[in-house]
Amino acid sequence: MAEKFIKHTGLVVPLDAANVDTDAIIPKQFLQKVTRTGFGAHLFNDWRFLDEKGQQPNPDFVLNFPQYQGASILLARENFGCGSSREHAPWALTDYGFKVVIAPSFADIFYGNSFNNQLLPVKLSDAEVDELFALVKANPGIHFDVDLEAQEVKAGEKTYRFTIDAFRRHCMMNGLDSIGLTLQHDDAIAAYEAKQPAFMN
């Protein structure tokens, strides 16, 4: 079972760029592994570092700013996660420590992959995201409260409502990935298999 997501309070980092694609999130040269760990070191590699080996941090990239170290909520712009359909993108984000991405819109495949990996993609309107960027930039180090059960983001003195479809919400709140969902029906699967003719087993 995956980790349950019900509520999360975390430091917010503002990535003020639209159309952030999966190659920017995790460049293709780091996709050799099929396990989910180890990708956080290369998250936004071409932006975070000045050299190809990832040894020289780029002081002008927001994730390297001291006030955003330990951030677990990423505030982004529209069409986040566009480009090729690599599941490594949410792997890199979660391995780095992100639990939530807030944006006006997401690429469809990235959006689905995020739920499969316990990364909550929160859609808010353009105007609401503009408000949040202004709030975070005026208050570096601010934390947001994200409540999946209530489907709310509390930021400063305001609360923002978002909607997640019931099935995905249920899965995240109960820590169910595709394997976990299958195991919920383990008894029924075993009973069905027991009824099959011997030559089918």
UniProtKB/Swiss-Prot annotation:
CDD domains: IPMI_Swivel. It catalyses: (2R,3S)-3-isopropylmalate = (2S)-2-isopropylmalate. Coiled coil: none annotated. Pfam families: Aconitase_C. Its EC number is 4.2.1.33. PANTHER family: 3-ISOPROPYLMALATE DEHYDRATASE SMALL SUBUNIT, 3-ISOPROPYLMALATE DEHYDRATASE SMALL SUBUNIT 2-RELATED-RELATED. This is 3-isopropylmalate dehydratase small subunit. The gene is leuD.
